[in-house]
Swiss-Prot record:
Species assigned in the record: Homo sapiens
Coiled coil location: 33-131
Location of region: Interaction with the C-terminus of SPBC25: 132-197
Protein name, entry field: Kinetochore protein Spc24
Segments for region (Interaction with the NDC80-CDCA1 subcomplex): 1-69
Keywords noted in UniProt: Cell cycle, Cell division, Centromere, Chromosome, Coiled coil, Kinetochore, Mitosis, Nucleus, Phosphoprotein
Subunit-structure text: Component of the NDC80 complex, which consists of NDC80/HEC1, CDCA1, SPBC24 and SPBC25. The NDC80 complex is formed by two subcomplexes composed of NDC80/HEC1-CDCA1 and SPBC24-SPBC25. Each subcomplex is formed by parallel interactions through the coiled-coil domains of individual subunits. Formation of a tetrameric complex is mediated by interactions between the C-terminal regions of both subunits of the NDC80/HEC1-CDCA1 subcomplex and the N-terminal regions of both subunits of the SPBC24-SPBC25 complex.
Top-level taxonomic group: Eukaryota
Protein localization: Nucleus; Chromosome, Centromere, Kinetochore
Interaction with the N-terminus of SPBC25 as annotated region, ranges: 1-131
Annotated Gene Ontology cellular component terms: cytosol; kinetochore; Ndc80 complex; nucleolus; nucleoplasm; outer kinetochore
Length: 197
């Protein structure tokens, strides 16, 4: 603004010079002053242009920084969505694993119960093999020696089959327990036993 005031002052001086028809010295002085004002104006203009270029450069840098920041925010949003999706998947997987663990725990408990039951049965079998089976084998051998009957254990259910090895001949046994009473079958088998033994 000061430069424009100086120009206005110089212009008024020139007008007064022309109007008053003053001396040449005053004209030179005013022309010199006019040149100084023009130089100052040009310097000011150069400075203003330089400042304007700097401001434009700064604006471009700020705009680029803003664009970079927006891109980073966008990338951050995408990464956040990916992390949230991953977190949701991890939560679902955790739920599936917990359900699977619960199922496996139940199965383990069932297996432990089965194992305990098997151990109990094994103990009972051990008792049977040490006490019951030897005595049953002894009784079966005794019955075989007394009755001389060789049993067919592979016959169909409900049938009593075997061979009685009597004193003179072997006689087949073929009885249907669904049509005959137990008493009849027992009496018949005992009737085969030789009384002279």
């Amino acid at each position: 603004m000061a430069a424009f005031r100086d120009i206005e002052e110089v212009s008024q001086g020139l007008l007064s010079l022309l109007g008053a028809n003053r001396a040449e010295a005053q004209q030179r002085r005013l022309l010199g002053r006019h040149e100084q004002v023009v130089e100052r104006l040009l310097e000011t203009q150069d400075g203003a242009e330089k400042q304007l270029r700097e401001i434009l450069t700064m604006e471009k840098e700020v705009a680029q920084s803003l664009l970079n920041a927006k891109e980073q925010v966008h990338q951050g949003g995408v990464e956040l969505q990916q992390l949230e999706a991953g977190l949701q998947e991890a939560g679902e997987e955790d739920t599936r694993l917990k359900a699977s663990l619960l199922q496996l725990t139940r199965e383990l408990e069932e297996l432990k119960e089965i194992e305990a039951d098997l151990e109990r049965q094994e103990k009972e079998v051990d008792e049977d093999t040490t006490v019951t089976i030897p005595s049953a084998v002894y009784v079966a051998q005794l019955y075989h020696q007394v009755s001389k009957i060789e049993w067919d254990y592979e016959c169909e259910p409900g049938m009593v089959k075997g061979i009685h090895h009597g004193p003179s001949v072997a006689q087949p046994i073929h009885l249907d327990s669904t049509q005959l009473s137990r008493k009849f079958i027992s009496d018949y088998l005992w009737s085969l036993v030789d009384t002279e033994w």
